[in-house]
Design a protein with these regions (language model features):
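A structural motif corresponding to the C-terminal end of an alpha-helix
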Residues: 60-71, 102-114, 165, 169, ...
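Canonical P-loop GTPase G-domain recognition
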Residues: 74, 82-169
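C-terminal accessory extensions appended to soluble enzyme cores
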Residues: 142-232
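Switch II (G3) loop of P-loop NTPases
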Residues: 1-18
Length: 232
């Protein structure tokens, strides 16, 4: 199951909303933190906290360590076309590393693996500029985009990478799990392993897909590692 929810839900005053989010995260295999890249990179990052809710995300995860301990977290910068074309994807990853340092320090203390996996969302357009927003309650500025060439085409890039990282984590966790004492095994993966352990062919096919992981190039970098995930 894949579930998306806005950052505002993390500070919801409705108890059932908070409990729903916590329970979903506690039973998740991987947590994706989407990053609107132009807000991260442009105008000195002035509007980054407002758009990407950096403090809210950081404090929520730190306050709910039991839901994320021993897991995989992917920071996924979106709308990276401009930075790919300008050869600046590594700068995007370094900015993520700098911006979320408090959170990744926390990850390092709690056996949480984290990586940056930038995505080229559309491919045919790229960021151009920021303009004032006229929508009440919206962020102060909105992104303006332009065509990348005369005949822009829909050409997303790197979109399967979060899935490849997820599969890598699942296969690594399965192998790690077999070495643990029964009382130490977490329950959040049980439903997945109930069929993996009985289908070795399926498991081997999953392992083959992990070879497509992009690592240490094109802005794909590790931020923290843990005792479970292994990427060559």
């Amino acid at each position: 199951t894949i579930r998306d929810f806005p950052g505002e839900y993390l500070t919801s005053t409705i108890k059932s909303d908070r409990e729903d989010i916590y329970n979903f995260m506690a039973n998740a295999t991987v947590i994706l933190i989407a990053v609107d890249t132009p807000y991260l990179m442009e105008e000195g990052g002035r509007y980054n906290a407002e758009k990407n809710k950096v403090d809210i995300v950081t404090h929520y995860l730190k306050d709910n360590v039991a839901a994320v301990k021993d897991k995989l977290v992917l920071f996924v910068p979106l709308k990276c076309e401009r930075y790919l074309h300008d050869g600046k994807l590594p700068l995007v990853s370094e900015k993520v590393k700098e911006t979320y340092k408090e959170l990744t320090d926390f990850f390092g203390q709690n056996n949480i693996a984290s990586f940056v996996t930038p995505i080229i969302t559309l491919g045919g357009i790229e960021f151009d500029s920021m303009k004032n927003s006229n929508v009440p309650g919206d962020v102060s500025k909105v992104s303006v985009f332009r065509s990348w060439n005369v005949k822009p085409e829909y050409k997303p890039l790197f979109c399967p990478q979060p899935l490849y990282y997820l599969l890598t984590y699942v296969t690594n966790y399965y192998e790690w799990q077999k070495k643990q004492k029964k009382g130490l095994i977490d329950s959040f993966m049980d439903s997945i392993y109930s069929f993996i352990k009985n289908d070795s062919k399926f498991f081997e096919e999953m392992k083959k897909l992990t070879r497509f992981v992009i690592y240490n190039k094109n802005g794909f970098i590790p931020l923290t590692t843990n005792s479970i995930i292994k990427i060559n």
